[in-house]
Amino acid sequence: MDISAYQHMNIRMSTRGKRPLRNLTPNDKVRAIQRIHNGETKASVSRDLGVPESTLRGWCKNEQKLRFMCRQLGPDHLGIDTHTPPEKRAKFDLQLLPPKLATLPNYDDLGLSNFLFSATEFPTQKESLFEKLSLVEFVKKNGLHPSAIRELGDTHSLNAAANAVSGVDYSTNNMINQLTLLAQLNSKLSYQMGESADTDIKSPQSTTDITDTAREENSTKTSCPLLTVKNWAKDPAKRAHFNQATQLNPNNDKNNNAVDPSYSNLTTMKYPLIMEPVKSIYPETTVSAIPPPPFSTYSDLASAASAPTTDNDCQGAALLDWCKLFNASLNFLAFAAAAASMQPAGGTIPKSTATQLPATEADETYPFNNNLVKRLSPLAHSDASNESYFDSEPEDLSVRSCASVSSRNNSRSQTPDKSTATSIACLSDGEQ
């Protein structure tokens, strides 16, 4: 037997004269099957391979399995590219390619283009749409009341035409709207601070020499009040009580200044829960060490009470809307207004004058409107939270504003910082 005829078929002969070992690869078997498909007889192919014809027929029956085994071996062991037909070679090449991921179907191919909203009809401002959706989720989580949402919609509907023309984003417009509302409140505060700075510079340091011009300015301020920490929720119907509480009965304290003892009654009427423990611990002269603010006469108060109060109602309504929108309480509003009033207006007033600015706020100390207070802060009037409410920061700030009045009058004996510290210490001891 000629062994050279089997060299190209990768057949090894262990010894001469014996049948060759049939360690044919699947590639060799597939090549033999392809030769049969090309027209060669099975006898000639079986004679070349050295296998019986029955074995070759078995290979032809298992042709698909043999081709699968060739694909598993990889392209290095194939070698049948020239013998396979084009259609089978194309299918074979597709099996070797990496699998393609299924692409998403087109929107119009799904037959949804006849719907009300198509993919091409959406505006290009996608960020504004996402921000509106996030705003809706924010409102749901924070639990804003539906009435407040309707009021917010009414306020935004006024600027709808301007937004359509300018194309301003919804979140930016919302922020600008709220900053405008805050600017209106702070503009009233800064306007009053400017007037108070002028009156403090022009007025003498002693409180005993109060002129008629100062009384006229105070009367005009009480007739047309501005938004401050003390009168932002005032009730004009209760102004008549101040005529009885502000009868001047001068006493002399340890600094020899004119002191009104009825101011302690005023403080007790306004802050009853704070001043009762203070009165029980400290004597009457210690509580009444704060000088009284100058008030107008009974005729001026009567004329102011008969004047229309639309400005006050508008201020209360604007404040209530602000409170509903920001979900704030009375403590936060009083703290913000007091902090804004303590700062100098425009940054042009020196620091020595800025410490004296809240002195004119005592000119307009009116009782709080109970209805507005209850609507703004429901927890403030509950029996369980009275102590926590009066221990909060806005009440301390109001005491500081009153103490700044006494610091200006007692500047000959002590500094404003010391007077403020002593008044706060008295308040903390009284609360304990």
From Swiss-Prot:
DNA-binding region extent: 42-62
GO BP term, example: segment specification
Signal peptide, first to last residue: none
One cellular-component annotation, GO: nucleus
Superkingdom field: Eukaryota
Keyword Ribosomal protein set for record: no
Example of a GO MF term: DNA-binding transcription factor activity
Localization: Nucleus
InterPro entries registered for this protein in UniProt: Homeodomain-like_sf (IPR009057), HTH_Psq (IPR007889), RD_transcriptional_regulator (IPR051839), WH-like_DNA-bd_sf (IPR036388)
PROSITE patterns attached to this UniProt entry: HTH_PSQ
HTH psq-type domain span: 15-66
Ranges for region Disordered: 195-221, 401-432
Acyltransferase keyword on record: no
Pfam families hit by this protein: CENP-B_N
Keyword terms, alphabetized: Developmental protein, DNA-binding, Nucleus, Phosphoprotein, Transcription, Transcription regulation
Polar residues bias locations: 202-211, 401-425
Record note on quaternary structure: Interacts with itself, dan, ey and dac to form a complex (or complexes) containing the RD factors.
Function of the molecule: Probable transcription factor with a role in the retinal determination (RD) network. Regulates ato expression and is required for normal R8 induction and differentiation. Danr appears to repress Dan expression, but Dan is required for Danr expression anterior to the morphogenetic furrow (MF). Dan and Danr lie downstream of so and require dac function for highest levels of expression.
Name of the protein in its database record: Protein distal antenna-related
Species annotation: Drosophila pseudoobscura pseudoobscura (Fruit fly)
